[in-house]
C-alpha cells in the first residue's frame, strides 16, 4: 500500500522502500502502478488519482485473480497456437478478459483509469468497426493514463510472463509475432506496431528484444562466430512471417557460403601464387647452381649434386677424360684388363701384371749376370795366354834371326877355310848346311801353329823326336853323298839355299 501511495502521488519514496520496490519484480501490482509514472502530464488532476486509489486496489485484486485463473487454465496445444498467430491470440484473450473485468465491475467503464468506451471499442467490438465518439472527459483520462499497449514495451512484464507455465508449455523457437493493429481512434496499438515474443528458456530470453538485453548473450554469440562463415542476420522479434525468416536465413546461408567460398578461393589462389613464387625461386637457384647437363656417356657426380661450379666441372671433365684415355692404354697393354669391368678390378689386374713383370725382370737380370761372369772368365784366360805366347814367339824369332846371322857368318868363314882347304873339310860344310835348313823349316812351322792354338807338350816332344830321327838319317846320307859328289856342285847348292 505504501508503495502504491508513493507511486500514485509521484513522490520519491525513501531509499529503503525504493530498493524494496526495485526487488519486487514478481508482483503484478508494482507493474500496474508503474504505469502512472509514465504519464506525460503528471501534475494535472493529481487529486483524481487519490480518489481512484481505493477503486484501483479493488480492481488490482480482481485482476490478479483473473490472471491467475488464466495462467492455471489449460490451453489446447494445436497448430493454431504453435506459431506467431497463437501468441497474438493469447495476448488478445488476456486483454479481452481484462476488458470484461472492467465491464462487470459496477459498470464503471474504466480499467485502471481507462474509460469503458475505449476498452469496449478495442476488444468488445469487431476490429474493423469505426471508433466510437469520445467526450472530453474520456479524452482527458486517456491523456492522463497509460494505454494497455505498455504490456509490450515493459521489459519487466516480459521477464515475469516468461516465468509462467502457460507461456512455456508451447514451443516458440524461431517464431515471430505478426503486427496487431487495434483501432482506437487514429492511434495504433504501439508506435512500432509490434508485440514482443516471450520465450520460456533463459537461453531464448536474449532473443526477446534488443532493449531488454543490449550487448548480452546475443552479442557474445555474434562475436564468437569465426571468420569465413556467413554473417547471419539477427532474429527480429517482429518479422512478418516465419517463412520470411526462413528464406532470409537461407539467403543469408547462401550468401555466407558464397562469401566463404570466395574467401576460400582467394586464400587458395594466394597460397598457389606463393607456392609458384617459391617454386620459381627454387628453380632459379637450382638453375644457377647446377651446371649444364653433360652428355649421356659421361655423368659428372659433383655437378649433378650441385657441388661444383661451371669452370670446375669443365676442368674436372677434361681431367677425367685424360685419365680414361690412359686407362684404355693400360687395358691394351695388360692382357687381363679387357675382360674385367670396373675400375677397382682393373686396377687390381694392372697391379698384378706389373708385379709379375718385375719378377720376370729380376730373374732375367740374375741369369744374364751369371752368363756374363762365365764369359768374362773365359775371355780373360784366353787373353792372358795370348799375351804370354806372343812375346815368347817374338823372342824366339829374334834369337833365330841372330842364330841365322851367326851361322851365315860362320858358314862364310868355313867357306873361306874350305876354299883354302877344300880338300880337308868338304863333308863338314855340307852337313852344316843340311842341318840348318830343316831347323829353319821346323821353326817356321811351329811358329805358325803357335798363332792358331797352343801346342801340347806331347806334340812338341814328338816333333823334336822326329826332328832328331830325321837329322841323323839325313846326316848319314849327306855324308855318304858328299864324299862321292863334286865340290863345285856343292858350292852351287849352298848359294841356292842361301
From Swiss-Prot:
Subcellular location: Nucleus
CC terms in the record's Gene Ontology section: nucleus
Compositional bias segments (type: Acidic residues): 271-281
InterPro entries, per database record: bHLH_dom, bHLH_ZIP_TF, HLH_DNA-bd_sf
Annotated Polar residues bias: 233-246
Keywords tagged on the record: DNA-binding, Nucleus, Transcription, Transcription regulation
Spans through the membrane: none
UniProt region (Disordered), positions on chain: 1-24, 207-297
Tissue-by-tissue expression: Expressed constitutively in roots, leaves, stems, and flowers.
Annotated bHLH domain residues: 307-357
Biased composition range(s): Basic and acidic residues: 259-270
Domain of life of the native organism: Eukaryota
Signal peptide: none
One example of a Gene Ontology biological process annotation: response to blue light
PANTHER family, alphabetized: STEROL REGULATORY ELEMENT-BINDING PROTEIN, TRANSCRIPTION FACTOR BHLH78
Assembly mode: Homodimer. Binds reversibly to CRY2 after blue light illumination.
Functional note: Transcription factor that binds DNA to G box 5'-CACGTG-3' and to E-box 5'-CANNTG-3'. Binds to chromatin DNA of the FT gene and promotes its expression, and thus triggers flowering in response to blue light.
Name the record gives this protein: Transcription factor bHLH78
